[in-house]
Regions:
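Asp-based, Mg2+/Mn2+-dependent phosphohydrolase catalytic module
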Residues: 1-10, 102, 115-116, 120-224
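N-terminal helical cap/lid subdomain that shapes the substrate entry/recognition surface
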Residues: 2-14, 19-98, 117
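Hydrophobic residues in well-ordered beta-strands that form the structural core
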Residues: 22, 110-112, 188
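A generic structural signal for short
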Residues: 24, 53-54, 89, 107-108, ...
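Short glycine/serine/threonine/alanine-rich loop segments
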Residues: 45, 74, 106, 161, ...
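Residue-level marker of regulatory loop/turn positions in helix-turn-helix DNA-binding domains and
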Residues: 93, 111, 144
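Internal catalytic-core helix/loop-beta-alpha segment
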Residues: 101-109
């Protein structure tokens, strides 16, 4: 049986990258390279300048894509297809996580700033292809990414989620602020990353965990 503070929950919302698999896999390293290559081709610059542009867009717009769309009119599908064309050999299924998600009662969703095609490739690699009731990606957000509040409202509206009866699990602490403000229970996966811990305000974090598989196993009654 779930702990008392979680027994009313009927919707579980999970971030994808660095949340459903360990951050040490560092898939973003591969995606980062592809982003740089895309920007180099787009603006005709070297790798150093492309990295500066990319990080500036991420800082100022929430995602590199948002910056590219606003500044260059980039086709989001073209960009996402390009940058997510990576080898997923760095990640593998976690049997404890797979089993714990299967035991978890309520609806389960993936909420990602990535796109559907990439997310489904990752979930398949993790043995979680059939573990979720819905996937809310950057296309469904109309390219307004987390942590913009509109992204969370769109998620709840699309899937008829009551924030007061939901949990959000996320490695980027700042992405939990809007969730908490909507009334969700928030779970921060603290992976030791300086970037992920940015804006880690305890007022917006209900649970701080190190490993999602271990935590879910514990709350679903199998912490062996």
């Amino acid at each position: 049986m779930l702990p008392a503070p979680l027994r009313h929950v009927d919707a579980w919302i999970f971030d994808l990258d660095n949340s459903l698999y360990p951050a040490k896999a560092n898939l973003f390293e591969l995606i980062d390279v592809r982003m740089g290559q895309f920007i180099q081709q787009l603006v005709g610059c070297d790798a150093e300048e492309a990295r500066r542009v990319q990080k500036g867009y991420f800082r100022d717009h929430g995602t590199t894509l948002a910056g590219l769309m606003k500044t260059h009119g980039t086709d989001p599908r073209e960009f996402l297809d390009f940058v997510h064309d990576i080898d997923l050999a760095r990640i593998a299924a976690d049997p404890k996580l797979v089993a714990a998600l299967d035991r978890l009662s309520g609806r389960k969703f993936v909420f990602t700033n990535g796109d559907d095609a990439y997310a489904r490739r990752v979930l398949d690699r993790l043995g979680l292809a059939n573990a979720f009731d819905g996937l809310h990606d950057i296309h469904a957000m109309n390219y307004v990414p987390k942590p913009h509040p509109d992204a969370y409202r769109a998620l709840c509206d699309r899937w008829a989620i009551d924030p007061a009866r939901s949990v959000m699990v996320e490695d980027m602490a700042r992405n939990l602020h809007p969730a908490k403000q909507l009334g969700m229970i928030t779970v921060w996966i603290d992976n030791g990353s300086e970037q992920a811990s940015h804006e880690a305000d305890p007022a917006f974090i209900d649970y701080r965990i190190a490993d999602i598989g271990e935590w879910l196993a514990e709350i679903t009654g199998d912490a062996t």
